[in-house]
Amino acid sequence: MNNIFSKLRDFVGLNEQVEYEYYEEEADTDNYQNLYQQENPQPAPAEAAPNNRRWREPMTTMGDDVATGTKSAMGNVIGMPGAINGISEVLVLEPRTFEEMPQAIQALRERKSVVLNLTIMDPDQAQRAVDFVAGGTYALDGHQERIGESIFLFTPSCVQVSTQGGVIHEVPQPPARPARPASTNPPAWGNETNRMAQ
């Protein structure tokens, strides 16, 4: 029985002897001062030796300075593409094949609006392309609108779409928090002094 366990340990590798490598280093006596036999102490240098430590200087990005006009203390914040300069971009795509559709999704991820002109595509491929981009737009909380025959507008969630008749898609604003009124009633547990917590 013991033989089976030893074979199992050998197979798994638990019986192997661990070999440690030992290094013997000679002491570098040139860098040490002999404190006990110092008869003629050396004069202290006029200038202290520079530290070998590397200090990290605070860095600011050009985008932070441009957006706020001042240097920002939060240099590690990375903004959304196109959000710093406030310029909205619209990408017009006229794809010939379905393989060009990931470009539209990437543009939506970069907060760009996409006008998709599918007039030169095969109708079956065009339907597949619209379904693909519409699914990506939905996943990114965007909006889609049909502009004309085989022409579609896909926008990210930060773009408000409107027509002459009114707003089709409005950018949601964060709800305002209602202020909590101060309670004038004292707590019920504060009046009972003879009760003990269990």
UniProtKB/Swiss-Prot annotation:
Organism: Trichormus variabilis (strain ATCC 29413 / PCC 7937)
Name of the protein in its database record: Cell division protein SepF
GO CC term, one of those recorded: cytoplasm
Region feature Disordered, mapped onto this chain: 170-198
Biased composition (Low complexity): 179-188
Gene Ontology biological-process entries: division septum assembly; FtsZ-dependent cytokinesis
Function: Cell division protein that is part of the divisome complex and is recruited early to the Z-ring. Probably stimulates Z-ring formation, perhaps through the cross-linking of FtsZ protofilaments. Its function overlaps with FtsA.
UniProt subunit comment: Homodimer. Interacts with FtsZ.
Membership in a protein family: Belongs to the SepF family.
Pfam families assigned to the protein according to its UniProt record, in alphabetical order: SepF
Keywords: Cell cycle, Cell division, Cytoplasm, Septation
Subcellular locations according to the entry: Cytoplasm
Signal peptide: none
